[in-house]
């Protein structure tokens, strides 16, 4: 398994969602380690907020893609039904 497989699709193209999740995890780990090193009292809140932002971005993109695909399928079915009625 190559390093690039962590954030690309099966065909080798860059995956936006996987990239956001992977680099978000890397950044969150860096923020956590740096905050622990500085001995800050707000580490859990900052870390969880950052992770929610990273996960939320990818999840929102997934929901938008699913709704878009459903809308396209509905349009195609409507066209097919219109052709059958003619």
Swiss-Prot record:
Region annotation Disordered: where it falls in the sequence: 67-86
Keywords: Cell membrane, Membrane, Transmembrane, Transmembrane helix
Domain of life: Bacteria
Annotated transmembrane regions: 20-38, 47-63
Biased composition (Basic and acidic residues): 69-86
One CC-aspect GO term: plasma membrane
Subcellular location: Cell membrane
Keyword Ligase among record annotations: no
Principal localisation: membrane
Protein name: Uncharacterized protein HI_1495
Organism, as annotated: Haemophilus influenzae (strain ATCC 51907 / DSM 11121 / KW20 / Rd)
